[in-house]
Amino acid sequence: MASTVSVQPGRIRILKKGSWQPLDQTVGPVVYWMFRDQRLKDNWALIHAVDLANRTNAPVAVVFNLFDQFLDAKARQLGFMLKGLRQLHHQIDSLQIPFFLLQGDAKETIPNFLTECGASHLVTDFSPLREIRRCKDEVVKRTSDSLAIHEVDAHNVVPMWAASSKLEYSARTIRGKINKLLPDYLIEFPKLEPPKKKWTGMMDKKLVDWDSLIDKVVREGAEVPEIEWCVPGEDAGIEVLMGNKDGFLTKRLKNYSTDRNNPIKPKALSGLSPYLHFGQVSAQRCALEARKVRSTSPQAVDTFLEELIVRRELSDNFCYYQPHYDSLKGAWEWARKSLMDHASDKREHIYSLEQLEKGLTADPLWNASQLEMVYQGKMHGFMRMYWAKKILEWTKGPEEALSISIYLNNKYEIDGRDPSGYVGCMWSICGVHDQGWKERPVFGKIRYMNYAGCKRKFNVDSYISYVKSLVSVTKKKRKAEEQLTRDSVDPKITIV
């Protein structure tokens, strides 16, 4: 039986009403423009698109637009994303829903596709980031008034606009609002069945040469190579969450609340951030499964849900309601004034972007954190705070510090260009979602962190050794791969 399950109205925003059509009248297809939530299962936007199609007896398709160098993403991020999409393409085919990959400026490709297929409805993902919102606004303007456009927040457990209608000051101010709505939104997903009506047109555009596309993207973005520690795709994400071998909830959960802030115990972390960032796993699925095992480790589950739901959704809130989410202008007034009062304070060291990027500072702990990010694609969460605060201490002023931290985060982190990444930099450097602390040079009233504090918290030498070993192994692997590539391009010919 085809899916007829409706999504809660509070999860949907109507961006354009479109023309009313009688139920017995043939209408155009429903198109789901996927971008932030790249999965088949547990996807409210796809569920809504199929439901719309079934209620209007129309076919449904999924389109994904590949932006040209979106926010300077490199092989590391694009390779991971495209390999996940390749898997998704095959999975969606099993439901007899066509998947179309478009390339270019979405402001042009999406309206053109909608016109060509005669769509009646467009369903889109939600993102708080300005580039996506501007693009979506243009798509709304450039499409026919007869087309209905619905935006679905399938990324957050509680939809961003339902959780709060304003910029929240801290986790404390949004936590109660989210928890109050969890009974309404933290519910099990319905099973997604094939749509009633099959898609028949434009099948020539459905073919995607994934191997060639991935090879091209990886080659062009080789400055930041792919990583091996996390396998892309929806299946891999679920395995990391709850696999029998090394799943977070099944094997590693009990140490989360006690060890998650210890950089020499990276296995205590969930390892889910790449999958959550690309939408290959639903945060709601993670929360549902975590609740099932709460009796075994209540403190660990509660801590995990705080990070997974409250902190992540606070980041979306900030990026949506604060247009200057990546600028000193976005800091609270007390923090901005304090930082500017101390902007001209003498710094012990001033490092260039190149020195910072290569980890060439006088602080071996900071260098290790930077190299962990460069070579592993994931800096430990505790070290991210120390890392960003030291950039504030070692650059000419807070604006430069924020700019450099965001640039490096977006370039090297597998989950870069995420609201949580922007907010992490803003918290560390600009005191966003934090309070004022004892005033001191350079930092003003921004929370201070130093080497001695880290040394009291964990074994600094062990962390530095761990990163050195990681870098050495990674370099050897890359050198061997590069030699293999050279040999395949220019093989040595033996004359007998």
UniProtKB/Swiss-Prot annotation:
Gene Ontology terms: biological process: photoreactive repair; UV protection
Note: Over-expression of PHR1 decreases CPDs accumulation during UV-B treatment.
NCBIfam families attached to this UniProt entry: phr2
Protein name, UniProt field: Deoxyribodipyrimidine photo-lyase
Keywords: DNA damage, DNA repair, DNA-binding, FAD, Flavoprotein, Lyase, Nucleotide-binding, Nucleus
Residue numbers binding FAD: 256, 269-273, 307-315, 415-417
Induction profile: By high-fluence white light, UV-A and UV-B.
Gene Ontology cellular-component terms listed: nucleus
Tissue-level expression: Highly expressed in flowers. Expressed in roots and stems.
One term of GO molecular function: deoxyribodipyrimidine photo-lyase activity
EC number(s) given by UniProt: 4.1.99.3
Main localisation: nucleus
Limits of the Photolyase/cryptochrome alpha/beta domain: 28-160
Summary of the knockout phenotype: No visible phenotype under white light, but inhibition of growth and leaf necrosis under white light and UV-B. Increased accumulation of CPDs under UV-B.
Gene designation: PHR1
